[in-house]
C-alpha cells in the first residue's frame, strides 16, 4: 500500500512540474520495459494496443478482466508509475466505474483514463450528468482505498467529431470543466491538433491537459510553450510496431532480404531487459 501511495503521489507531481510529462503508450511487458529503460518517468497503457495484441477490436470489446490482467503484468514489471487506459470503465453505471477503479488500483496502476465515448454507440457520448457520477465514483473508490489515483478524464467530442463544428469547442470546454470539478486531476480531448485551439483550451481550463500527439501535431517543445502538461501517443506506438513487422514481411516475401531487421535489439539485450524486472 505504501509503495502504491508513493508512486501515485510522484505521478501526480509529474503533472505540475516544469517539464512536460511524456507518455509513449505501451501494450505489454516488453514495450513497458523498453519505455522505462529509455528514461521515461512513467508508463501509460493503450487500451487499443492491448486489445489489438490480444486479437480484439478497440472499443470495450475486450473484457475488464482481460485488460486488467495485462495492466497488472506491466505494473509488476516496471519500477515507474503506471497509468491505465480503461476506456469508459467497462460498464454503463457509476458502480461499474468504481469497480474498475478498484481493479486498476489492485493491478498496481496509480492512474487511469476514463472516457465519455460509448463503445456500443461510437457516435454517441455518455450524458454529462451520468459521466460526472462515474468520475465521482472513481474518486470515491480511490479515497476508500487511500490511494491518490490520478484520474485523466477524456471527452471524445473532437475525436468522433460530435455535433456542430461551430459548437464543438464550447461543448468540449463545458464537459472538461465539469469533469475537473467532479474530481478529475487531468483532462483530455483527443483529436485536437492545432496549436491555437490547444493554447486556447489551456488558457480557458487552467488545469493539467493531456494532448494525444502524432504526425501533424505541434512538437513537444511547442506544446510545452502552450502550457500542455502531458503528451501521450495512444495506440500509434503499437500500430507503428505492427507497421515495422509488415515491412519485414513484405521485404522477405518480395526480395528475400532482411534489411528491416537491422535495428532489432539483440537476443542478449532482450534477455537483459527481462532480467532487470523488479
Where do the model's predicted regions map?
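Flexible, glycine/charged-enriched surface loops at secondary-structure junctions
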Residues: 148, 255-264
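A short, charged, Gly/Pro-tolerant segment at domain boundaries
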Residues: 261-278
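Alpha/beta enzyme core
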Residues: 2-233, 240-242, 246-247, 251, ...
Amino acid at each position: 500500500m505504501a509503495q502504491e501511495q508513493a508512486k501515485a503521489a510522484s505521478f501526480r507531481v509529474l503533472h505540475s512540474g516544469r517539464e512536460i510529462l511524456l507518455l509513449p503508450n505501451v501494450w505489454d511487458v516488453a514495450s513497458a520495459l523498453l519505455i522505462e529503460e529509455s528514461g521515461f518517468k512513467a508508463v501509460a497503457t493503450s487500451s487499443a494496443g492491448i486489445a489489438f495484441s490480444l486479437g480484439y477490436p478497440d472499443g470495450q470489446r475486450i473484457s475488464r478482466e482481460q485488460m486488467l490482467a495485462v495492466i497488472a503484468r506491466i505494473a509488476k514489471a516496471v519500477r515507474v508509475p503506471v497509468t491505465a487506459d480503461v476506456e469508459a470503465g467497462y460498464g454503463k453505471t457509476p458502480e461499474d466505474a468504481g469497480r474498475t477503479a478498484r481493479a486498476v488500483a489492485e493491478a498496481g496502476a496509480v492512474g487511469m483514463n476514463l472516457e465519455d465515448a460509448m463503445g456500443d454507440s461510437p457516435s454517441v457520448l455518455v450524458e454529462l450528468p451520468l459521466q460526472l457520477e462515474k468520475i465521482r465514483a472513481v474518486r470515491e473508490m480511490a479515497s476508500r482505498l487511500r490511494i491518490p489515483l490520478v484520474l485523466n478524464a477524456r471527452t471524445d467530442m473532437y475525436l468522433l467529431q460530435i455535433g456542430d463544428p461551430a459548437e464543438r469547442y464550447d461543448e468540449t470546454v463545458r464537459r472538461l470543466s465539469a469533469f475537473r470539478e467532479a474530481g478529475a486531476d487531468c483532462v483530455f480531448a483527443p483529436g485536437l491538433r492545432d496549436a491555437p485551439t490547444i493554447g486556447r483550451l489551456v488558457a480557458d481550463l487552467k488545469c493539467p491537459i493531456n494532448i494525444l500527439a502524432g504526425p501533424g501535431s505541434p512538437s513537444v517543445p511547442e506544446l510545452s510553450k502552450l502550457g500542455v502538461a502531458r503528451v501521450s501517443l495512444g495506440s500509434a506506438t503499437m500500430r507503428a510496431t505492427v507497421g515495422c513487422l509488415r515491412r519485414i514481411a513484405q521485404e522477405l516475401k518480395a526480395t528475400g532480404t532482411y534489411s528491416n531487421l537491422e535495428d532489432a535489439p539483440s537476443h542478449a539485450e532482450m534477455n537483459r531487459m527481462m532480467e532487470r524486472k523488479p
